[in-house]
């Protein structure tokens, strides 16, 4: 039977404190959070027990069934969120690498939302794992993770990214500037909103979603993740522009990471990924067609679509 990890035990202790303060509404919400992580909290006169829930009970029928903590103040510094649409071992590698280079002085949680059917035990100890029935798509899985995000800063990481040093602290520090909306090491720019190319920045049109950090309140105010984006491609551009149209900047911040093969791209049949990419780009253009006022620079030449 699975043992409760650090994230589960922390929720249980917070529920004990809420009940002690007679904040029963919060205690009930924390109980639901525990259930979403696969554990039932059974109260005893001298404490409590944490009992694993059968996987089919622990799974949620939809991401929006995940209890939201967004109405409560952030009580952590950073939430690192991962989504799994296959290749759980890549995400496990990524979590382990970020944990091995954990920032000093920052309270960090890792949240995994799995839509691939992987077992929660596939991921490192200490990560909170939300199991979703079926794969509702990239945007919906990211929404589920956001609903559980307690950090003042939300960091999106793709399973193809591995940390080789402290990648979190530089991102958080860059977001201390209130004029900055989102940051990450991989930036892109465009001359015409149709073709995007990599750019070293510092200011860019969009941050690629392989590694992207944003303040939680900014992400929520911008509308969160668009669940129509079932495939990841261009969802990061759309999110970047929704944040930047609020008058905030996107900055490239160099961090110590390495990138492996993006298996969600390379293992998807070419015809399928091209069709999904085209649909996503049209969604972006529906919202931002003609908004060249949002472009940070012009320039000669293009190198094809990115995102």
Regions picked out by a protein language model, each given a short descriptive name:
Residues 196-217, 221, 232:
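A recurrent flexible, glycine/aromatic-enriched loop bordering the glycosyltransferase active site
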Residues 55-96:
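N-proximal low-complexity "stem/linker" segments adjacent to membrane-targeting elements
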Residues 220-252, 256-259:
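Donor nucleotide-sugar recognition loop
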Residues 64-77, 101, 181-184, 191, ...:
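C-terminal, non-catalytic tails of nucleotide-sugar-dependent glycosyltransferases
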Residues 162-196:
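Conserved donor NDP-sugar-binding/catalytic core segment of glycosyltransferases
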Residues 154:
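Short aromatic/hydrophobic "clamp" motif used to bind/position activated sugar donors
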Residues 133-149:
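Glycine-rich, basic loop-to-helix element that forms the pyrophosphate-binding segment
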Residues 96-107:
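Short, acidic, metal-binding catalytic loop of nucleotide-sugar glycosyltransferases
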């Amino acid at each position: 039977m699975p043992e409760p990890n650090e994230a589960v035990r922390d929720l249980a202790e917070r529920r004990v404190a809420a009940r002690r303060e007679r904040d029963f509404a919060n205690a009930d919400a924390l109980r639901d959070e525990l259930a979403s992580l696969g554990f039932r909290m059974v109260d005893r006169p001298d404490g409590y027990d944490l009992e694993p829930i059968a996987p089919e009970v622990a799974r949620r029928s939809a991401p929006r069934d995940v209890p939201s903590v967004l109405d409560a103040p952030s009580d952590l510094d950073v939430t690192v969120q991962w989504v799994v649409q296959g290749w759980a071992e890549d995400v496990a590698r990524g979590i382990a690498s970020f944990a091995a280079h954990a920032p000093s002085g920052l309270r960090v949680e890792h949240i995994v939302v799995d839509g691939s059917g992987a077992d929660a035990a596939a991921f490192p100890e200490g990560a909170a794992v939300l199991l979703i029935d079926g794969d509702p798509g990239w945007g919906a899985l990211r929404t589920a993770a956001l609903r559980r995000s307690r950090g003042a800063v939300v960091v999106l990481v793709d399973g193809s990214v591995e940390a080789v040093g402290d990648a979190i602290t530089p991102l958080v520090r860059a977001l201390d500037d209130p004029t900055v909306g989102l940051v990450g090491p991989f930036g892109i720019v465009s001359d015409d909103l149709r073709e995007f190319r990599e750019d070293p920045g510092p200011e860019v049109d969009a941050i690629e979603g392989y590694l992207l950090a944003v303040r939680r309140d900014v992400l929520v105010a911008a509308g969160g993740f668009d669940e129509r984006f079932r495939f990841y491609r261009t969802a990061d551009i759309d999110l970047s522009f929704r944040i930047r149209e609020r008058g905030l900047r996107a900055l490239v911040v160099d961090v110590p990471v390495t990138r492996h093969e993006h298996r969600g791209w390379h293992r998807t049949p070419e015809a399928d990924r091209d069709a999904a990419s085209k649909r996503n780009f049209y969604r972006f253009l529906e919202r931002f067609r003609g908004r060249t006022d949002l472009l940070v620079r012009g320039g000669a030449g293009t190198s094809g679509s990115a995102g």
